[in-house]
Amino acid sequence: MRGITLLACFTSVFADGNDPRDFDSDLLMPGFHFVPFPWDWQNDPNGPMWDPVHEKYHLFYQYQTPRMWGHAVSDDLVDWVQLPMALKREHWYDQGGDFSGSATVLDDDASTVVLTVSSSDNTEIFVALPEDRSDPYLTNWTLPDYNPIYTTDARDPTEIMKTSKGTYRIADGTAVGTEIWEVNAFEDIFTNDTWTKIGTFQSNDGGAYWECPDVFPLPGAEEANLWVSKYSRSGDHYYLGMYDEDAATFTPLERYEGNPKTYDHGPFYASKTFLDKKDDASRRVLWGWQRMDKPEDTWQGQTQGVPREVKALPVTGSNKVDESPFYLTNFPIKELETLRDEDSHVANALPGGAQSFEIHDDEPVLLDAVSGRMLDMKFDIDYLNDGAQACGIRVLWTPGSDEYTDVLIDQRWVRYRATKNIGCWHHHHCFHSPRFPRLSVKQERKNYLANSHIFICLHSITTHRFAPYSLALTENNVGTDVNFRVLVDSSIIEVFINFGEETQTLFSYPTTSTSVSVGLIGAHCVFHSFESWNMNPYQFDASLVM
């Protein structure tokens, strides 16, 4: 009965007038990426969590300047109710800001929910508790008098983790890596004299702070004791390795030593996962902050990426090497598909409704059956020969103009160059895929500013990083297909290659409402099974803060 009552509550608040978004006047406003209201700065997704008592998802995030904690709640990780701020700089230790941390539902009865928070000067770690645990929204939070629980030169504490021995641990980020603090009993969590630093989970020899650490067993690889150690520093990077609970240490797999992988090769940062136990399922859901390089005056171009499921997939065949038969993927959660407009579904979107379509030159081919500012598309590409260079799709396109964004896989060795008429900058991003190591994602967009061009390439470089996976297009593997999932949301594009084996967030800045067309582009490749949907915006109720 509780589920029915809460659903009725959500239905009533999603009434006309409670959603402040205006998609007609703001061409860049995303429809299915979370943006908080009132419009203001947001960044790190501090404390995503599932509350089993009230059957709600919560999202906490860095909000405004100086930083405080914003808060929203959902039944399904798709539609959201905006709540008042959870933390608002009310004590001596958080006057400079309530900076990043995590949320934890403690113990089997789930009676206790704790926010772990860091201070602006990276010295104080403190906790917050809900004022009323019976409130299904957990609207109001309090900072107990025993705060801060410990003082250290660290930041961004993780959730509180219970060990097999019944002790409780927190990991936080430091200039020398990820450190571990521990208390022996549940009641000791809520004191300021029992937390003890027990060691360094993983060392960082670079001397730069590891921000927003995340530590968790990789779903699907638990029997192999395969864990993820993630940190944020000029991107969100992770290692796969072995966790020794007794020693509280992490040892990366040999192929990851000194060479972490990356969740997303675009502006995706300060990510945080949580264990989702809804419907007795145990999945790991990933949130990440996406920051535009062209901030908006209203919502400031700061969004959260779509929630993604993190899990292991097996490495098969000749690519199975070293200690682990698994690799990590991150891919949109299934619930996102509820926003698909089924009336707009095109099962065979290629020209003529064909299952396959071959292109041989670089002239774009318009897809008459697909158009829109908010789209979900999936398709495969085969590369025909070693003359195949870059193949992909053109989106947010006004045919006959320079208003478009190309999302391409480029199998050549390419370099990265970006030029704007407001300055010039150069950068390199590298990834090496276990199955397609010489493929790269390239984006070209010509709509940032008038007469400006931006070329973005993810590229592989000659390296021994993953030498056992070396692959080139030869007579033996021509025809190997690459799977795409592309989400377009007005100004945000998320690209998932091979079901989340590699991902990239991109931004585009259309200037006209006619930039809605989609096309194929490339040479010497074949597109297969192109399927598309227009997407509906999520339901957003901001009435509690209006």
Q: How does the language model describe each region?
A:
Residues 216-217, 275:
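Short glycine/serine- and small hydrophobic-enriched flexible loop segments
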Residues 15-156, 160-211, 219-264, 286-354, ...:
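Beta-rich carbohydrate-recognition and catalytic domains
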Residues 17-20, 234, 244-269, 275-546:
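Beta-rich accessory regions
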Residues 210-213, 268-271:
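Repeated scaffold domains used in trafficking and secretory/extracellular systems
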Residues 5-6, 76, 105, 366, ...:
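Acidic/proline-rich low-complexity IDRs
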Residues 3, 119, 173-174, 187, ...:
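Short intrinsically disordered, low-complexity coil segments enriched in acidic
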Residues 1-16:
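Fungal secretory targeting signals
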